[in-house]
Design a protein with these regions (language model features):
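Thiamine diphosphate
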Residues: 1-126
Length: 126
């Protein structure tokens, strides 16, 4: 197996899944800049930047999953997941039970975690 950085492995896995399933979409803050190779290969309809509102775009991911897409929601820093927990815990996680099994919201949520960016305590979880 080739030796890859963590970022390269994520990029490769996303590209592999996006090539295999046209329902896989990626969105998040500056995701088109973070994943330029994916944006070039799959286009703006599948690699979509989102506004700086984690709760809004995670909720959009839940809706996209309910509509049949397979979203990968990239939250820039793990610190910001907390502001989006309502969509994740009260909607995505409980949807199947609340709907008697009629609805599901399969999605992936990714976030960077760790220090070293010099962005301050609310951006690093160092």
């Amino acid at each position: 197996l080739p030796e890859l950085t963590f970022a390269e492995a994520i990029e490769r896995a996303l590209a592999q899944e996006m090539a295999a399933d046209e329902r896989v979409v990626v969105f998040g803050e500056d995701v088109h800049l973070l994943r330029p190779a994916l944006a070039a290969r799959f286009g703006a309809e599948r690699v979509m930047p989102a506004p700086i509102s984690e709760s809004a775009f995670l909720a959009a991911g839940v809706g996209a999953a309910m509509a049949g897409l397979r979203p990968v929601v990239e939250i820039m820093m793990v610190d910001f997941v907390a502001v989006a927990l309502d969509a994740l815990l009260n909607h995505a996680a409980k949807l199947e039970g609340f709907s008697g099994g009629r609805w599901r919201a399969p999605l992936v949520v990714r976030a960077a975690c760790g220090g070293g960016y010099g962005d301050g305590g609310q951006h690093e979880q160092a």
